[in-house]
Amino acid sequence: MNKIAFIFPGQGSQVVGMGLELYKNHLKAKEVFDAVDEALNQNLSKIIFYGDEEQLKLTSNTQPALMAVSIAMVKVMENELGKKFTEFTEIVLGHSLGEYTSLCSINSLDISSASKLLRIRGDAMQNAVKNVETRMVAVIGLELEIIEDLLR
């Protein structure tokens, strides 16, 4: 088998129900979600699978939730292939919080530590903009001059 690269997602790719089929059908995935719940002393899995979208979108929940789903997929792949992730993966990368997931995927961080770090990171990011209205817009296909005019 050729070695491959994995890029783990950042915040914004979350959706209620993500990972539920993994949880229901693979013991290794269930073990990941259970470990995250235990580390955070919270039933985050319930929020991930059945929760309110606004609750999942809270940065303090989103970050460990996305890590949990990604690591659950890693553990299922390891189990199905009968190989450690590092045996069939050449490189791991992550976008934003995905960097933590990539470290966890190669056992540089354990699931419990990654969960706790991402909760702290999520809380810090959430609190940094608590009383500030923020927005983000993606601009695709416009010339730089037009964008600069719009920003003035």
What annotation goes with each model-predicted range?
Residues L66, M73, S102-C104, A124:
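Hydrophobic side chains within alpha-helical segments
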Residues Q11-Q14, L40, K84, S105-R152:
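Alpha/beta catalytic cores of group-transfer enzymes, especially the acyltransferase/condensing modules
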Residues E53-E54, E90-L93, L97, G122, ...:
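Short, glycine/charge-rich beta-strand/loop segments that flank catalytic centers
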Residues N61-M67, Y100, I146-R152:
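Short, charged low-complexity intrinsically disordered segments located at boundaries
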